[in-house]
Every structure is written in C-alpha cells, then in structure tokens.
Amino acid sequence: MKQEQVRMAVLLMLNCFVKATAPPPWPPSASSASFLDDLGDLGIAPLIRADEAGTARASADFGNLSVAGVGAPRLAAAAAVLYPSRPADIAALLRASCARPAPFAVSARGCGHSVHGQASAPDGVVVDMASLGRLQGGGARRLAVSVEGRYVDAGGEQLWVDVLRASMAHGLTPVSWTDYLHLTVGGTLSNAGISGQAFRHGPQISNVLELDVITGVGEMVTCSKEKAPDLFDAVLGGLGQFGVITRARIPLAPAPARARWVRFVYTTAAAMTADQERLIAVDRAGGAGAVGGLMDYVEGSVHLNQGLVETWRTQPQPPSPSSSSSSSFFSDADEARVAALAKEAGGVLYFLEGAIYFGGAAGPSAADVDKRMDVLRRELRHERGFVFAQDVAYAGFLDRVHDGELKLRAAGLWDVPHPWLNLFLPRSGVLAFADGVFHGILSRTPAMGPVLIYPMNRNKWDSNMSAVITDDDGDEVFYTVGILRSAAAAGDVGRLEEQNDEILGFCEVAGIAYKQYLPYYGSQAEWQKRHFGANLWPRFVQRKSKYDPKAILSRGQGIFTSPLA
C-alpha cells in the first residue's frame, strides 16, 4: 500500500512538472486524437505529453537529416511521448495500443542516436527510456553490479559509460563495447554493438546473460538462452521489432588499469588488412601466428585530407604537451611526416589502430606490453618509422570518442546532419571496395568525417540472433566499414547522400555482397530482398507474428507498418 502511495505521489509530481514546463499544448492530428483521448483513461496518463516541444524532440535523432531540409521527412512526427516511471508503464501503453482496432505506433527512444528516424513513432507514442532511471530516484537501483556473480544488471535506459563506471568501481568491466559509450544499453543491444574488441569477444549481443523484455502485446518476460530463448535471440539485434529491453544482465571480467594505444601507418589497404587479419586470428584453425591475439582491440581507419571534423573520433585527451595540432595523437613534427607520406602515397593512408590492455588485477605488466610491441614492430608490414603509441587510462581509452564530441560541440560541429553509412563487407570484396571507394569516390571530395575499416571473426556472432551480417561464403573473416561524415555546410547533406548512393551502386556493379549495419531501407520489399534475404526473412516474419503481431513496435524502421494478424 505504501509503495503504491509513493508511486501516485510521484505521478502527481511529474504531472505538475510537465504542466509547469511544457509550452502550450500542441493539437494532435486527427488520426491520433482518438487514441490520445483513450490514454487519458489509463493510470499512466500523467506520464504522457503531447505538446509540440516534447514530440519534436522525441521525433528528432542524431542524423538530423529531416531537419536539414533536404526533401520531405520520411516519417511523421510522434503524437505523444511517454515518460515511464517503471517498466509496467510501458507494458500498459503497449496493451492499450494492442487493444485498439487500429493500433498506434510505439517506439523506445534512448539517446536518439539513429540517423534515419529509426526510433520514431509516426503519429504514435515515443517512450522516453531515460525516464526510467530518473524517476523515483531509481537510477542506482537500475544499475547494480554483482561482484560474486561477475555481472551487472543494467536498465535498458542506462548509458554504457555509466555501466563502465559502476563496474570499474569494483575492479570489473564488460568486455565488448561500442566506440561511443554515451549510448543506451537497450539501444546498442537492439542493433549489435560493435567495436575493436568484437574480433575476440563478439559484438555486445554475444555478451548478454539475461534480458527483461516487454513484447509488442505488453507481456513482461525475463528471457535468456535457457528461458524463452527464441525471444532472447529475437530481441538481440532485432532492431526493436520484438520487444523493449528494460534490463540486461552483462557478464564482467577483471578490469585492466591502462591501455597502450597504438597506430601503425600503411600506404596500401592490402598491407593493412592483411596485418589486421593476422592480429585477429584467435581461436581459428591454422593457428594465430606470431602476432595473433597480441592486441586486445583492433580497428583501422582511412586518412583522407584530415582536419578537426575528420579526426575527432581518435584524439587523446588531454592533448600531448608536445603538440599544438588539431590531431594531438601526433607531435607537430610527426604530423608533418605523416602528411608528407600521404602526399607520396597519392593522398590516402591507412592507420591500423589498436590497444593492448595492462595493469589491474589480471592484466599483463608494462614490461610485457613492451615485449609485445617489439614483436608487432618487427612482424607487421607497416611503413617503418611510422609507429605511434601512448599509454592512457583504460576507461579513458574506451571513452575517447566523447572527448572528440566535446571538441566538436565547442566548435558548433556536433549537432549537424550526419548522413552516415555503415556496411558489412565480405572479405573477398574489401580490396575492390578500397580501390573504388577510398581511392575513387571519396578521394574526390574532402573527407568530412572518420572512415573506419576493420575485420571481425564470424564465429563470434550467434546466427540464431536477429542481427544480419554478410552471407556465409565460407570465409571466417568479414569487414565493417563506417563512413561517418558530418554535413556542416549548406548543400552538404544532399551531396553526401548522393555519394552514399554512389558507393552502394559501386558495390552492386562490383558484385560486393554488402549488408548495411544500422540499416535503412525505404520499403518492406527492400528489407526482404537486400537485408534479410530468402533465408532469414521467414524467421524474422515468424518472430514478428509471435511477439508483435499488430506491428506496433519500431515502425520507424520501415520493416512492418501494418498488422500481421
């Protein structure tokens, strides 16, 4: 009874807060007015806003592409926003939608880091997941580390950077990350969650012990590989189509204290990718060779006329005292040498970027890292004299992209349109892609953002989960490419989107069987043909029919926009 009284008091306080802070109410569209009236009869009514400021914010995302004014927005704005105080509020909303003859769309929104409106709910309700950690003082209770069990229970709304901090306080850490940690647990697990650790540990979805999920029919389910495994596999990498993740149990390992952050410079894609593949050759038939497994993190990037916007992702913080340049990983003298090498190489260089973790309870010593570096310098086929290294805090290395974000925000270059393109490529097509795209399409214009390229091991991915990677062509290795550009000037968005289309067209002509990561397609037919294919589409539809038959969830993805049953 006391608990319910506290809840009602919180609802009343929130209702007063919303009324005090919201601008004048925004009239809902005719299509949404009736269901908004119905929601007024629910116990969650005080948690719902339908004002223009709230719905506009919930309908925007990191991509900012509709804001850029290039063409018409692909999706209508949300009609309302739910600010839940507990998972049961989300379940009540979904049951209310499911009970209607014409169900309204519902989408969970974490940090809004999608780039094509994937988390939008056209004429429906966006769920502001961050509210779960704010209301009732519940943030701490929704992020709990079990030292004995070696896991962390994190609410779906929790940021990975906070998961890191909570775990590190106990000398522990998750092992698989994204490069940017200011994303929600539920958001990355709905896609895959990849970074330079994925070659060894798999994506984040391969590192989950248990989930709490609310399905499209409003059922609250705890699932794992042992309990409701089909739902567990469906939700992980499921693009928000089968349920809302409200809790994830993530395994932990002893945390290192430091990271040796290194860059090896190459003049050809062939040399760099060959070395990357040697470095990730762990747990593979044929052995790891002299360098396999020596690094804990392996990525790579393409150097194309870099400036602040292009290098923000991998700048150490604070800057080296010996450097006044915008790219503080290098001294001024080293940056001049790299620029000269780039000119000799025709304007394109490749950086193999890696890290070796050390210190802490179970990590190697600094002396052991020095020995590994000696082997790497000797064995890798980089340009001699072009190896750069810094020792940084482990947590600082993982959160390095945030430092770049702060620099871009200070320069007014963060909240701009981001027409990003992320691809998975078969190993057989990566060199043709490098030749046609890095040395062709992208070389004709300024880079305007980081360009990443690195390999992963197929056997670290679970094919029962919903995430889609390149077709199994018998090759253990496949690649991810991230072309992460910012449209800072007028006219950039249209030009960059046209260039993205040109890149995809090049892949089609060259026979490179790519898959989009963080995908965006304009129709269900394209999703079926280009993304899932004949083998995976039937399973995806079957799971949708089972867990969200009225296609309420995540309509912004454009996969299902009308009920299946």
Curated annotation (Swiss-Prot):
One of its GO terms (cellular component) is extracellular region. GO terms for molecular function: cytokinin dehydrogenase activity; FAD binding; oxidoreductase activity. Its cofactor is FAD. Glycosylated. GO terms for biological process: cytokinin metabolic process; cytokinin-activated signaling pathway; inflorescence development. It holds the Pfam family FAD_binding_4. Coiled coil: none annotated. Keywords: Cytokinin signaling pathway, Developmental protein, FAD, Flavoprotein, Glycoprotein, Oxidoreductase, Secreted, Signal. Catalyzes the oxidation of cytokinins, a family of N(6)-substituted adenine derivatives that are plant hormones, where the substituent is an isopentenyl group. Is a major QTL involved in grain yield. Modulates the number of reproductive organs by regulating the cytokinin accumulation in inflorescence meristems. Acts as negative regulator of panicle branching. This is Cytokinin dehydrogenase 2. It comes from Oryza sativa subsp. japonica (Rice).
